[in-house]
């Protein structure tokens, strides 16, 4: 067993991969746990164990809870993927419609995208489409970041296949995320 561990460790180093124990040291952001007592949180998945790629929205919604996904309307913007996009850009969906699409296209990676959650009682005609969220907003990297769209409750951002950002995530959903990913980080200005 030790020979196999040494072999795998050497192979990982030669290929340039980072082991999960090393990945904890690479993130510049502080661990999220324990979460402070507050109504919303700005969180970041980077250097987490057990994540084959960071922008698998089906998996993220499953962890947050499909029930939560269905509780909101969703505006999806700034979509880019390495596949034939299942969603037009921009896209307005009920939570049930988003769930159906994400389940129909499992493990689909969004390289860039912003999933903005809206109250279930807001109509598409009431949404200001002049201020569409961008996945490359510099405001994410500031203390106390807020959802980009003025009417959004929170945002999930697929950032260059490297990170998944959660801006203004409600406390209940933040606890689910941190429970699933103990390596989850607090997003703050460094």
Q: Can you annotate each of these PLM segments?
A:
Residues 10-27:
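Low-complexity, charge- and small-residue-enriched intrinsically disordered regions
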Residues 6-15, 145-190:
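Acidic, proline/glycine-rich low-complexity IDRs
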């Amino acid at each position: 067993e030790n020979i196999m561990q040494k072999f795998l460790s050497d192979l990982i180093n030669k290929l340039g991969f980072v082991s999960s124990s090393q990945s904890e040291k690479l993130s510049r952001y502080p661990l999220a746990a324990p979460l402070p007592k507050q109504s919303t949180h700005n969180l970041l998945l980077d250097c987490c164990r057990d994540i084959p790629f960071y922008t698998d929205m089906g998996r993220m919604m499953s962890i947050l809870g499909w029930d939560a996904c269905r509780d909101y309307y969703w505006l999806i913007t700034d979509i880019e993927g390495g596949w034939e996009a299942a969603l037009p850009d921009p896209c307005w969906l009920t939570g049930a419609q988003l769930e159906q699409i994400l389940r129909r296209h499992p493990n689909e990676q969004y390289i860039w995208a912003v999933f903005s959650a809206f109250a279930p009682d807001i109509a598409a005609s009431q949404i200001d489409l002049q201020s569409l969220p961008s996945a490359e907003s510099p405001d994410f990297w500031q203390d106390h970041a807020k959802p980009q769209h003025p009417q959004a409750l929170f945002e999930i951002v697929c950032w260059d296949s490297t990170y998944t950002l959660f801006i203004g995530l409600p406390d209940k959903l933040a606890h689910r995320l941190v429970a699933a990913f103990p390596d989850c980080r607090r997003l703050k200005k460094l």
